[in-house]
């Protein structure tokens, strides 16, 4: 069964005759197809009875919460056989990006390590005599802004989105 969600017309208000098709070459656990640089079909490689967790959670957030910090589910394909259902694919808007979260984290960690390596030992003196938890609580105001630079704002935004996600998931 192929179906559109209530979000379909909002997500794709115009012509949905997609003729340009390309496969994403990224290493991931699913196969993804991009349509006219507007839509993404995520094909689940592991097919099991019941909904795929990625599909089920994304669909719930799209249809039952106000959480907007993820690509909404516009449709899907389910296989129904012998009274059992399995999710095969999900349709979402295609959101181009300059990279992925894992690479961002690796780059940030490398930059942090390089900055720490270049700092003289005197930079650590404000933490002398502090227990680990007190130092961790004080670190953001003493050193984090200088060492993390713009990444600190990205980490704060990630934390805020994660908190919003958990609130949305708990809202049911």
Model regions and ranges:
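Conserved ATP-binding subdomain of kinase catalytic cores across diverse folds
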Residues: 1-172
């Amino acid at each position: 069964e192929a179906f559109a969600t209530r979000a379909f017309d909002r997500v794709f208000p115009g012509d949905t005759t997609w003729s340009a098709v390309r496969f994403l070459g990224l290493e991931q656990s699913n196969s993804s197809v991009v349509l006219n640089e507007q839509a993404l079909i995520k094909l689940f490689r592991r097919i099991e009875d019941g909904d795929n967790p990625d599909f089920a959670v994304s669909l719930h957030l799209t249809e039952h919460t106000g959480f907007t910090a993820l690509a909404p589910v516009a449709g899907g394909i389910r296989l129904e056989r012998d009274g059992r259902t399995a999710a095969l694919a999900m349709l979402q808007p295609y959101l181009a990006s300059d990279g992925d979260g894992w690479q961002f984290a690796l780059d940030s960690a490398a930059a942090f390590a390089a900055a720490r390596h270049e700092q003289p030992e005197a930079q650590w003196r404000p933490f002398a005599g502090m227990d680990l938890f007190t130092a961790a609580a004080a670190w953001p105001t003493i050193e984090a802004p200088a060492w993390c630079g713009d990444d600190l704002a990205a980490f704060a935004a990630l934390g805020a989105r994660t908190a919003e996600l958990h609130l949305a998931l708990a809202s049911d």
